[in-house]
């Protein structure tokens, strides 16, 4: 199940949240293997060569599905999921050096969900969709769950101390190296990062709710795929496709948001 939402409810355009559950088909890229699962239970696996492109595979997979209805206001069907940074080598001519990976999650995962709930928070209304393949409509069951009493919230607590894959000194050396390459003209920008890990006990969705309450970023997401969960936030949309046009919004401190869409556009 996944949750896509916005905390920027000041205008109608940014007021839609999506809840998707009951995946009936999916496409996954992990360890050079592209796996596809279809609603009829059939599956297919393709062993990829180094840097083999997957865009056409993804496009062909998505084109197999269509719905009987379309909404101009909401995304009522389609594939929902994520593409990690490391997947870029299967879309562009970029070669990564081999590294020991201790986070075993797919580089890319998209699913076709049987149920999609589009919530217009601005108007306080919800639209429920069911995509059925040789199965009966389950909207009555979904409505029953929504009308049930609110579930119990669970606690969240840290266990032990946080740790990182880099020490402070090691990270400082990386920054110096990045500055050196900028001065040389090899690159105009380098985004450096380090990973922090924190053991915990409790419900990670509680942590997401805390992030949502304190983070000013308008776009937030929570993905629960059973074996792993991914959640976070973004200051702005990186790619927007609307009315047949695609807009790219670089994310690197290039655009200051005021909270007022009209003022931001000016």
Region annotations inferred by a language model:
Residues 1-266:
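Extended alpha-helical targeting/anchoring segments
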């Amino acid at each position: 199940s996944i949750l896509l939402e916005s905390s920027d409810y000041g205008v109608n355009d940014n007021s839609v949240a999506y809840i998707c559950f009951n995946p009936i088909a999916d496409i996954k890229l992990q360890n050079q293997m592209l796996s596809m699962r279809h609603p009829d239970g059939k599956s297919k696996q393709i062993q990829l060569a180094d840097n083999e492109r997957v865009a056409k595979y993804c496009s062909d997979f998505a084109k197999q599905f269509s719905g009987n209805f379309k909404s101009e206001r909401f995304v009522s069907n389609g594939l929902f999921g994520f593409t990690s940074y490391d997947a870029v080598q299967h879309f562009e001519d970029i070669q990564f050096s081999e590294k020991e990976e201790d986070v075993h999650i797919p580089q890319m995962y998209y699913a076709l969900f049987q149920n999609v709930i589009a919530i217009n928070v601005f108007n306080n209304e919800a639209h429920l969709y069911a995509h059925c393949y040789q199965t009966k409509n389950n909207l009555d069951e979904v409505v029953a769950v929504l009308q049930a009493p609110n579930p119990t919230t669970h606690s969240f607590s840290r266990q032990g101390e946080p740790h990182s894959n880099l020490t402070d000194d090691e990270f400082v050396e990386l920054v110096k190296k990045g500055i050196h390459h900028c001065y040389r003209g090899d690159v105009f920008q380098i985004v450096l990062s380090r990973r922090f890990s924190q053991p915990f006990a409790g419900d990670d969705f509680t942590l997401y709710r805390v992030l949502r309450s304190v983070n000013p970023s308008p776009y937030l997401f929570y993905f629960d795929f059973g074996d792993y969960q991914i959640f976070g936030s973004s200051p702005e949309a990186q790619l927007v496709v609307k009315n047949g046009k695609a807009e790219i919004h670089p994310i690197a401190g290039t655009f200051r948001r005021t909270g007022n869409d009209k003022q931001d556009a000016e």
